[in-house]
């Protein structure tokens, strides 16, 4: 399943206690369904410093999948850590993680393509007002957030739209595109 907006994630199938937020355009694996809630696994990497609250999509790439509350990020029943390695570029230690949490069955799609199509259209529409927008693969995944933030003051986007467009740009950056840079 793929999220289409920021969604609260919970410790249990009652939604009584929030564990954090799932970011837009994030893929999760369904483990179990119970009433209005679905238990999902969020796979990714986190920096192995501090509380490791932000789960990133790939090793060394700042493409946020979810942000956990401190209590959830340090709970062994929620987060399982695996392989550890150091990012040669930054010297920061990272670890592979899987977080098991619950979400409400809403704002989720079975396919990422409609999300990318809407994000691409929003990028083309909003980011060509002042200038010709750079090709998605012109920057790498970690450069796009800074470039994108610099342009946000000139457009009127809500938080979910901003996050969707940024993730679209990162997932179509030079790190993921064929034949660029």
Regions found by a protein language model. Give the residues of each.
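C-terminal capping alpha-helices of c-type cytochrome domains
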Residues: 155-181
């Amino acid at each position: 399943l793929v999220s289409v907006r920021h969604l609260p994630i919970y410790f249990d199938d009652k939604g009584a206690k929030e564990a954090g937020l799932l970011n837009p355009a994030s893929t999760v694996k369904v483990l179990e369904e119970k009433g209005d809630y679905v238990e999902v696994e969020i796979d990714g990497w986190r920096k192995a410093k501090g509380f490791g609250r932000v789960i990133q999509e790939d090793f060394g790439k700042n493409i946020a999948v979810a942000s956990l509350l401190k209590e959830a990020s340090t709970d062994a029943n929620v987060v399982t850590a695996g392989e550890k390695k150091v990012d040669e570029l930054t010297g920061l230690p990272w670890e592979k993680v899987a977080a098991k949490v619950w979400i409400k069955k809403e704002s989720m799609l079975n396919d990422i393509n409609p999300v990318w199509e809407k994000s691409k259209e929003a990028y083309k529409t909003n980011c060509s007002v002042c200038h010709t927008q750079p090709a998605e693969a012109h920057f790498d995944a970690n450069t796009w957030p800074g470039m994108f933030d610099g342009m946000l003051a000139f457009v009127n986007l809500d938080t979910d739209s901003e996050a969707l467009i940024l993730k679209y740009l990162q997932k179509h950056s030079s790190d993921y595109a064929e034949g660029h840079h």
